[in-house]
């Protein structure tokens, strides 16, 4: 892990290696937050690395891209979100995330949440947020990324 100057010297940044097969398809930046989206060659996984403050505007742009991605699909796909670098999220985000249910080809929504407290909070919103699987460890995240990296068109 390396130090992140934006958050001061006491906060360490997440430095997991994304498998080479992944292709960056979109970067959404706001003043305080960012979402970078990648897909595997077979387009069966859309992977999002979120960081900073996840505002309603940032989330709305992300969900618009996810919806466009879904419309371009003819096969089932998985949406995997890494929240390790999220510092704060707007309290209404769970209501917006409920829109994920409207994607016809989305078969699974997986979220990596390293914090036990945040996993508990997300479980409390279980009826609002359609999370199919919550990952606790970086190893679980890396395993899913590696499995999907091996898939070909």
Regions found by a protein language model. Give the residues of each.
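Amphipathic, Lys/Arg-enriched alpha-helical "gate/interface" segment within cytosolic domains
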Residues: 2-153
